[in-house]
């Protein structure tokens, strides 16, 4: 998958005037590209509002982040669980109308979640960094900032708001970007969850030094379709290499039932990331426990 970072806008100059010409290529090819183009504008705005040097000063005064990776490897359940606080998505719209992020996070913590993921993208997922900060103040579990990171600035911004880990999506980052971002994440004492969807992306990531945690996304970010076989196929192809390198693997998206959990155990992953199937239930905490209970009512 090739994602263009900015829309190509051919321009015609006439003297001191410059006219942008609309062409078919000026439109995003898929949802992921649309998100990335909007993220470019968002980061420009944030950097103007609060320069990186100011972020780093504030971060230096913060306590160190929690150890997301170690916590995942010592989960209390057969599979570690990253429970996600998520209000909406581009494919499903609003998932939960009475959305109270702190209350949901507390229910996760009370019901055996290993770590918590917080959607912070505002435009497409109706999340916010304020949600992340508020959850950080109210729960003790390590937090993953779930967003679309395309600049190092966003790593620092996530840390400032309480993130212990960040998501790095291989489909929107070059190898050079991934290497540099991972160095920054490590320098801040955080964890990088590097996300892949295809075998080609997985092989790219396996060749990058410093990767310790990989997420296999069962959701195709071009059209947001979901197939749990994605995890099974990638694990079947590269399980030995992953184990040899000591890399933990998280299966992300599309996990709704006890049967799905068993499927992932058999696939050989170390953890699952679950959001939508929990948030849409009346009690997300109870829903989390029921994922591991064959005799749920």
Curated annotation (Swiss-Prot):
Enzyme class: lyase
Domain of life from the UniProt record: Bacteria
EC number: 4.1.1.48
Pathway assigned in UniProt: Amino-acid biosynthesis; L-tryptophan biosynthesis; L-tryptophan from chorismate: step 4/5
Pfam families, A to Z: IGPS
Keyword Methyltransferase among UniProt keywords: no
One Gene Ontology MF term: phosphoribosylanthranilate isomerase activity
Catalytic activity: 1-(2-carboxyphenylamino)-1-deoxy-D-ribulose 5-phosphate + H(+) = (1S,2R)-1-C-(indol-3-yl)glycerol 3-phosphate + CO2 + H2O
InterPro entries recorded: Aldolase_TIM (IPR013785), Indole-3-glycerol_P_synth (IPR045186), Indole-3-glycerol_P_synth_dom (IPR013798), Indole-3-GlycerolPSynthase_CS (IPR001468), RibuloseP-bd_barrel (IPR011060)
CDD domains: IGPS
Recorded family membership: Belongs to the TrpC family.
Protein name stated in the entry: Indole-3-glycerol phosphate synthase
Gene for this chain: trpC
């Amino acid at each position: 998958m090739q994602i263009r970072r900015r829309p190509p806008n051919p321009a015609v100059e006439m003297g001191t005037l410059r006219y942008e010409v609309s062409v078919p290529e000026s439109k995003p090819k898929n949802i992921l590209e649309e998100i990335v183009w909007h993220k470019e504008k968002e980061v420009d705005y944030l950097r103007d509002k609060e320069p990186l040097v100011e972020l780093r000063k504030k971060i230096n005064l913060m306590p160190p982040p929690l150890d997301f990776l170690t916590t995942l490897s010592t989960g209390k359940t057969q599979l570690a669980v990253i429970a996600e606080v998520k209000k909406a998505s581009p494919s499903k719209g609003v998932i939960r109308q009475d959305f109270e992020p702190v209350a949901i996070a507390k229910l996760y913590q009370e019901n055996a979640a290993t770590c918590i993921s917080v959607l912070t993208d505002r435009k497409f997922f109706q999340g916010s960094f304020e949600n992340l900060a508020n959850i950080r103040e109210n729960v003790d579990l390590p937090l993953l900032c779930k967003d679309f990171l395309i600049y190092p600035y966003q790593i620092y911004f996530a840390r400032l708001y309480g993130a212990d880990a960040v998501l790095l999506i291989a489909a929107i980052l070059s190898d050079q970007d991934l290497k540099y971002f991972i160095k920054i994440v490590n320098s801040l004492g955080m964890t990088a969850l590097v996300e892949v969807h295809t075998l080609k992306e997985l092989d790219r990531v396996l060749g990058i030094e410093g990767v310790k945690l990989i997420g296999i996304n069962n959701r195709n970010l071009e059209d947001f379709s979901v197939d749990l076989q994605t995890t099974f196929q990638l694990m079947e192809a590269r399980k030995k290499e992953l184990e040899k390198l000591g890399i933990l693997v998280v299966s992300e998206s599309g996990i709704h039932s006890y049967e799905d959990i068993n499927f992932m155990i058999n696939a050989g992953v170390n953890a699952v990331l679950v959001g939508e199937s929990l948030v849409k239930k009346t009690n997300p905490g109870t829903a989390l426990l029921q994922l591991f209970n064959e005799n749920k009512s």
